[in-house]
Design a protein with these regions (language model features):
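NTP-dependent small-molecule kinase module
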Residues: 73, 104-112, 134-168
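ATP-binding Walker
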Residues: 13
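Pre-Walker A (Motif I) flank of P-loop NTPase domains
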Residues: 1-4
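A glycine- and Lys/Arg-enriched "phosphate-lid" helix/loop adjacent to the NTP-binding pocket
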Residues: 44, 97-144
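P-loop (Walker A) phosphate-binding loop of NTP-binding proteins
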Residues: 10, 22
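Hydrophobic anchor at the beta1->P-loop junction of P-loop NTPases
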Residues: 7
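ATP-dependent small-molecule kinase phosphotransfer cores
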Residues: 27-86
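Walker A/P-loop
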Residues: 16
């Protein structure tokens, strides 16, 4: 069965930057947030949180289809914070984390509103994504990479994790 590697974390932790580097190194990647918008895999746009409310059923069906039809020798890399695939489709999950200071700065640079910044900072403090991934996939398939360091160093650590999983 074909599987995916998830690159996840609170918005602003570096998922897309790292996934783009993986793509440049030959890994097939999907930016899940972009896919949701382009293929309208959402219920509606929430003005308060300034985000799309994802239709999980539609998204999972589409992601499973993409995983099953992946023709690469590598597993599909899924970049996003809304991915909760059935465990049998997930090879490994890399959760990117960063300090609150860095997160606030990165989200401010994206021109996020204060409410959205606060919501994401709270999610990072409460370890919501890490907790969800551990519950879904178990500690043997989840690892954490700190992204407060340079992009190059973060990418190097993620690449080590990906290669470790591929060699198992």
């Amino acid at each position: 069965m074909k599987k995916a590697i998830l690159i996840t974390g609170t918005p602003g932790t570096g998922k897309t930057v790292i996934s783009d580097l993986l793509k440049q190194n030959g890994f097939p990647t999907i930016e899940v947030g972009k896919l949701v918008k382009e293929e309208e895999l959402y219920e509606y746009f929430d003005e308060v949180t300034e985000s799309y409310v994802v239709n999980d059923n539609l998204l999972n069906k589409r992601l499973i289809d993409l995983i099953e039809n992946n023709t690469s020798n590598y597993p599909l890399i899924l970049d996003g914070h809304v991915v909760e695939l059935p465990p049998n489709f997930v090879l490994h999950c890399i959760v990117l984390r960063c300090s609150i200071q860095h997160l606030r700065q990165r989200l401010s640079e994206r021109s996020y509103g204060e409410a959205k910044i606060d919501e994401n900072v709270e999610a990072e403090i409460m370890e919501i994504i890490l907790t969800d991934m551990l519950e879904l996939y178990g500690p043997e398939r989840v690892c954490v990479v700190q992204s407060d360091i340079s992009v190059e160093e973060t990418f190097a650590q993620v690449l080590v994790e990906v290669k470790k999983v591929l060699n198992d």
